[in-house]
Amino acid sequence: MLYMKGTPKMPQCGFSARAVQCIEACGVDFAYVDILANPDIRQVLPQFSDWPTFPQLYVKGELIGGSDIIAEMFQQGELEPMLRDAVAA
């Protein structure tokens, strides 16, 4: 689940756009929540996750991180197997 600003087709910030690019390049379907359309989630999720910024990627209920971590994992070849494993589960 990607909590992001905007939608995958219309990201509303560069960080969300970069996260979507990396995830889509892995070739897996993913769910997302547009936090701009859900102000309650936008306010509460950073307190819950102890992660102050968006996007936030969760896999199997666990926070993976934001845009920088997603991009780093993608570049190191770690993101795709993790996402494929989650989709297969």
Curated annotation (Swiss-Prot):
Keyword Iron-sulfur assigned: yes
Binding site residues for [2Fe-2S] cluster: 13
Signal peptide span: none
Domain of life of the native organism: Bacteria
Short name of one Pfam family: Glutaredoxin
Single Gene Ontology MF annotation: disulfide oxidoreductase activity
Residue intervals of the Glutaredoxin domain: 1-89
CDD domains: GRX_PICOT_like
Alphabetic keyword roster: 2Fe-2S, Iron, Iron-sulfur, Metal-binding, Redox-active center
Binding positions for glutathione per the UniProt entry: 5, 42, 54, 67-68
Family note: Belongs to the glutaredoxin family. Monothiol subfamily.
Protein name, per record: Probable monothiol glutaredoxin GrlA
Lineage of source species: Bacteria, Pseudomonadati, Pseudomonadota, Gammaproteobacteria, Legionellales
Record gene name: grlA
